[in-house]
Regions:
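Non-heme di-metal
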Residues: 2-216
Length: 216
């Protein structure tokens, strides 16, 4: 299936595109879309399906082992908990192998867009249908949980899109006004419109700075 990317806002459309198509995000016309080069050499093959199955299996195993580690730790089995966590990290790397083979690991802007679209699907479609199905079968408490999680996924999408805008406009480390920057490594504070290229205290690079936030 072909993928077309809006040159204005970055929205990705999958499948055929009619001449009168309008971008659902910025309303740009079909002439503002460009075809995305396919990075998956396994597209359309049984191997591609196997790679997705392997990725899903390893990802689920990683989460399960993390949960199992918590149970073991609470029961007093420190070594077993540590082994569960170590294996979970192994599974994470296995999943990464298959995800990269599928060509799904892009640059930060692409990853933010991909993440935002995934969250959008979850709160607008997936959990909405799950909640309806649960209600139809009498599982009202679970339906409420599905809707509660959907509301959270909506905020996740909004956050990813805001971060994507920062990346695209080069505003991650440069703001329009004076703000308080904090080094994530040593805690050094800088009052400025832009984060320093290097922390003057611990010498960590600009990438370690973020706008200081207080929630206490």
């Amino acid at each position: 299936m072909q993928k077309l990317k809006c040159k204005i806002c970055g929205y990705v459309h999958e499948g055929a595109m009619e001449a009168d198509f309008k971008c659902p995000i910025c309303k740009a016309g079909a002439d503002k879309f460009e075809k995305i080069e396919v990075k998956n050499p396994y597209a359309g093959t049984k191997t591609e399906k196997n790679l997705w199955a392997a990725f899903a299996g390893e990802s689920q195993a990683r989460n399960k082992y993390t949960y199992f580690a918590s149970v073991a730790k609470k029961a007093g089995y420190e070594q077993i908990a540590a082994i569960f966590l170590q294996t979970a990290e192994n599974e994470k790397e296995h999943a990464k192998l298959w995800f990269k083979a599928l060509g799904e690991l892009g640059d930060t802007a692409e990853n933010l867009l991909h993440a935002a679209e995934g969250e959008n699907y979850e709160w607008t479609d997936m959990y909405d249908q799950f909640a309806k199905d649960a209600e139809a079968e009498g599982f009202y408490e679970l339906a409420a949980q599905f809707r509660g999680v959907a509301a959270i996924e909506k905020t996740h999408e909004e956050r990813y899109r805001a971060l994507l805008t920062n990346v695209e406009t080069k505003a991650v480390f440069e703001k329009s006004g004076i703000v308080m920057w904090e080094c994530r490594n040593c805690g050094h504070l800088v009052l400025s419109a832009s984060a320093p290229e290097k922390c003057p205290v611990c010498n960590h690079p600009q990438s370690y700075f973020e706008i200081r936030k207080e929630n206490y």
